[in-house]
Structure formats: C-alpha cells, structure tokens
Amino acid sequence: FDQLDTALYQAEKMLKEGADIIDIGGESTRPGFAYVPAEEEIERTIPVIEGIRKRFDTVISIDTYKAETARAAIKAGASLVNDLWGLKRDDEIANVIAQAKVACCLMHNRTNTEYVHFMQDMKADLEESMELARKAGISKDQIILDPGVGFAKSVEQNLEAIGKVGELLEFGCPVLLATSRKSVIGKTLDLEVDQRLEG
C-alpha cells in the first residue's frame, strides 16, 4: 500500500462501520505536534480527498484552520470545513467557507486555559466564532458546533463539557462531539490509547 491506498482502505472500512463523515487532516492535532505549512497540508490531503470523492458517496470534511488548504480541499470535493480554532486563526477562512457555501464545524479552543466560569466562558468563545461566521456571510444552517473535548481543558472540564453538551443546542446548530481515543477517556477509564474506543 502507498499512503493513498491506505487512506482509501481506511475510508472504506469506516464507511462500512457506519461513518457519516470522513474527516481528512494534514496536520496532527495531538498535543506537541508541529505546525505544517498550507502547501504541505495540501500535498498530503488533496490526493486523498480526490480519491475518496471518486470512489465513495459520502461527506468529506477537511480538518484545517488555514484558508488556503480549505479552498483547495473544497475544490477537490470536501463539503465541510472542520476548524479546530473556530475561525479565529486565519482571517480569510470564514470568507472561503461563505463563498463556497459549504458547512463548517466550529470547535471550541483557546490558547489561554484560565476560565472564570467554565461553561459560560466556553459558550462565549463559541459565540465569538459564530459572530465571525455571521460577519463573513455564513448562515446558521451551515454551522456545526464542537465543544472541543481534549483542547484547552482539564480532565474535569472535559467531563463537564461532555455532560453538559446539550446546553450548546441553545445556539440552534447541530453539535458534534469528538471523544474517541482522547486522553480524558484514558484518564477516566484508565485505558491506554489503543483501548479507548469506548470514547
């Protein structure tokens, strides 16, 4: 297998297991991983997106916070932009999403982990992301919200975000919860990373 064959095999396996969305990323979001320039991210992701688009009828998501990567991925067949910085890292990405009229997943994240009232602060941060979307011309029906489990949160805060995830529905958008293999699952259930599929 080359990398493309491996990715296509994995996508097929996930779809057979019931996946609704195939999320493709060219930069690891795990703690401690290095920044990847947009050009390299594009080289890594576009062949995979094109390959999946040719073979499968499914929603393809591009996991990026970079406008240049999002633009190339949409052109290649992605219909969802999964931005782990909630439109706050690249000023142009909201415009790319608005112009293409694709869906976007706005994840909660922040560089500062000091919260006064955790849920209130998290919702205020997500509200800022939604305002950036609105200003760019992204309609509410294009938006999915993600509480960002595993990002800028303690174990206790992650568990609170999971337990109170229903509160995010007050924004009037669907909510996506990504917990599989995250460290909060490992710490809560005392499991190694390869045994965390309960997430």
Regions found by a protein language model. Give the residues of each.
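Active-site-adjacent loop and "lid" segments of alpha/beta metabolic enzymes
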Residues: F1-Q10, T29-G51, F56-D57, T64-A67, ...
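Residue-level marker of intrinsically disordered, low-complexity segments enriched
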Residues: A19-I22, E50, I60
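Conserved strand-turn element in the central/C-terminal portion of the radical SAM core barrel
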Residues: I143-A152
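Catalytic domains of carbohydrate-active enzymes, especially glycoside hydrolases
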Residues: Y9-G25
